[in-house]
UniProtKB/Swiss-Prot annotation:
Matches recorded under InterPro entries: GPCR_opsins, GPCR_Rhodpsn, GPCR_Rhodpsn_7TM, Opsin, Opsin_lateye, Retinal_BS
Gene: RHO
Keyword S-adenosyl-L-methionine: no
Glycan-bearing residues: 165
Protein name (database record): Rhodopsin
Post-translational modification: Contains one covalently linked retinal chromophore.
BP GO terms, sorted: phototransduction; visual perception
TM annotation in the entry: 19-43, 56-78, 93-115, 135-155, 183-204, 246-267, 279-300
Keywords carried by this UniProt record: Cell membrane, Cell projection, Chromophore, Disulfide bond, G-protein coupled receptor, Glycoprotein, Membrane, Phosphoprotein, Photoreceptor protein, Receptor, Retinal protein, Sensory transduction, Transducer, Transmembrane, Transmembrane helix, Vision
Length: 301
């Protein structure tokens, strides 16, 4: 109770119907996420033709999503059943840390997947191909930096506290001190604004490069009096473009999933009078659903 911000005490308990609804949602989402990401990992690790450096990033994405739901799913089921957080202060902090860690690792894995697509499509043969060593280094960098940022609240830079709905825990976005707010400013930039800027830049350049390539192909075909110049290399380029569209869709879905949680944090900092416990549930709903999207998108590919 000492970790719950005074802001939440002004609200009555949530409508009891919200808890079974959230429980059912988490049950469905949890099963789909764990099964989907497990299958993704298993297929990529056991199919020799898929064990490429680029697909190591896909496996890392599936692992971060799997780990997120594996650690979030059971506690959420318990708290929804009891209508409040019953797992203690220490586990509340661990729970929030793991959620932030997996979310951070997920988005930066998507950023590196996007950058790899950029390197392949835009730079082509002039670009340095992704090696297993480089992909492994990228993955290690993702997890080390994500861990560094997410462990900071344990040492006094912000803190992990129960959410207003009391079914989960997250960063403290209601405290007014500059130390707590500075963490949220920098962390929001690190896990949202910077990745978004990099992703938008990469895809703008990719779209321009693909458009220029297609125009060149059409112009050359007209000069030669044929319908198409498509050859094996062109078909390969087309396949790379399809992969880029898949990656772009996945990144877009990730941002749709995490934007509500970002807004909750910023509303909590600057306009908390508008923030009720019920609204904080939407951050959970969208963020947890994100872990289901990725295996579906890559299975289609």
């Amino acid at each position: 109770l000492h970790m719950i911000h005074l802001h939440w005490y002004q609200y009555p308990p949530m409508n009891p119907i919200m808890y079974p609804l959230l429980l059912v949602f988490m049950l469905i989402t949890g099963i789909l996420c764990l099964a989907g990401n497990f299958v993704t990992i298993w297929v990529f690790m056991n199919t020799k033709s898929l064990r490429t450096p680029a697909n190591l990033l896909v496996v890392n994405l599936a692992m971060s999503d799997f780990l997120m739901m594996f650690t979030m799913f059971p506690p959420m089921m318990i708290t929804c059943y009891y209508h409040t957080w019953t797992l203690g202060a220490t586990f509340c902090q661990v729970y929030a840390f793991l959620g932030n860690l997996c979310g951070c690792a997920s988005i930066w894995t998507m950023v590196f997947i996007t950058f790899d697509r950029y390197n392949v499509i835009v730079k082509g043969v002039a670009g340095e191909p992704l090696s297993t060593k480089k992909a492994t280094l990228w993955i290690l960098t993702i997890w080390i930096l994500s861990t560094t940022w997410c462990v900071a609240p344990f040492f006094g830079w912000n803190r992990y506290v129960p959410e207003g709905n009391l079914t989960g825990c997250g960063t403290d976005y209601l405290s007014q001190d500059i130390l707590s707010r500075s963490y949220l400013y920098i962390y929001s930039t690190w896990v949202y604004f910077l990745p978004l800027a990099i992703t938008i830049y990469c895809y703008v350049v990719i779209i321009k490069a693909v458009a220029a390539h297609e125009k060149g192909m059409r112009d050359q075909a007209k000069k030669m009096g044929i319908k198409s110049l498509r050859n094996e290399e062109a078909q390969k380029t087309s396949a790379e473009c399809r992969l880029a569209k898949i990656a772009m869709t996945t990144v877009a879905l990730w941002f749709i999933a995490w934007t509500p949680y970002l807004l909750i944090n910023w509303v909590g900092m600057f306009a908390r009078s508008y923030l009720s416990p019920v609204y904080t549930i939407w951050g959970y709903v969208f963020a947890k659903a994100n872990a289901v999207y990725n295996p579906i998108v890559y299975a289609i590919s």
